[in-house]
Amino acid sequence: MPPGGWRWLRGLWAAGQPLFQGRALLVTNTLGCGVLMAAGDGARQTWEIRARPGQKFDPRRSVSMFAVGCSMGPFLHYWYLWLDRLFPASGFPGLPNVLKKVLIDQLVASPMLGVWYFLGLGCLEGQTLDKSCQELRDKFWEFYKADWCVWPAAQLVNFLFVPPQFRVTYINGLTLGWDTYLSYLKYRIPGPLTPPGCVALGTIQTEPPDARQQGKTD
């Protein structure tokens, strides 16, 4: 990179430092969670629009995702502060405490955030509590199993190497793909997307089933 590029990056870094200090850090973490969750939903909706001709972008859906993400930001901010005070650790010498933090995060924060996500979106979108709870029962274990596949390794890196003030920002940086998955899990349409009178990909149907049945009867 030319010297001018390095100077520009250093200037950008210096300008951004106040966002990660004092009370501004809480605002940064809160808005970061909301923006990344909305961006993940936007990416998912873009894919859905390509896969389903006629579907239009739903801005209210992304706004709901933004609101839920912002509501999670303060929790994550104080959650990591609490974990760091409870189990202080730095680098590989602190690995035992780091592993404790990863385990507690998976057993406490992850399921809590899953419940928060489904019930929060259900509330914002006008679902009844019974319907939201049923959706949570239907999808929670799928969410939680996927969570165990992704986040323990990510949090291990987070607690080992990332400075405390950047922990939520680091997580936000990784969550674009994860939030896209969460949007898919929340809004997916069950079953194959096939028009009436057709069948799933890989089979051939030349006439509707009712017509074939009528022919047999005749």
Swiss-Prot record:
It is a multi-pass membrane protein. It comes from the Eukaryota. Keywords: Membrane, Mitochondrion, Mitochondrion inner membrane, Transmembrane, Transmembrane helix. Its main location: membrane. GO terms for cellular component: cytoplasm; mitochondrial inner membrane; mitochondrion. Interacts with the large mitochondrial ribosomal subunit. Belongs to the peroxisomal membrane protein PXMP2/4 family. Required for the assembly and stability of the mitochondrial ribosome. Is a positive regulator of mitochondrial protein synthesis. This is Mpv17-like protein 2. The gene is MPV17L2.
